[in-house]
């Protein structure tokens, strides 16, 4: 009897171990520190080759972690950039916190200031940005009332960014001029629209690769919401996704959403938590997929850059 009890308990233990195996993290993989000695890392973004760019914001520089595993400086100074995102043309969009602007940076590191205010009022401080993928739409006949016909054409998607208020010691500006909102910048890079006005402190933001859904974290209220994106960038069908806010966000090939703060919390598309990734830092700011195969999860956390090998991979919209 004692033998059978021991056998049964052993089988239970094995079953528990198997049940605990992650469906998204590569077998045997652990969080590895790739680089350190930074002041505060933020805004990781992956280019088309798989290189990951991130900011060391207090030191006013953008760094590059190459696919070959080497660290280099891409831009210094960089307007104290925070959140970053690449567009399809290879430009790097940056939330330039020094003067509360939105920048577009070319491959040589030359920046263009795209936005610096909204209807004459200064932004609080653009924080995180997501570039909506281009989408295909059928052309129309000469009559606007006719249904779409003919070949499909590619339509640029524009971009969304959050604008919370975090007072910086280096600001020389006056007091806060606007509420903390979320904005949509149309593909002409001139027309900007306020699309979310009812959140306490919007921060992390990410969308799906088909450009249909947008996730926005209200870090001030400790919640994350999901919205449906209309063709003109307007948002509808607001729905609570999970009871957790986030500093930064990304999405994987299975539609799972990654939230940051105390480590990395992963939720499936239904909003159920499926994984908690512990990071040996006081605060985890942001996250993205990178590498040649997009199967390395890059984590910017306080003084370090970390990596974790995954089973799932990143998508173009992350």
Predicted ranges, named:
Residues 1-5:
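Positively charged n-region of N-terminal signal peptides that target proteins for export
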Residues 6-16:
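Bacterial N-terminal signal peptides
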Residues 18-318:
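Sequence-structural signature of mature extracellular/luminal beta-sheet repeat domains
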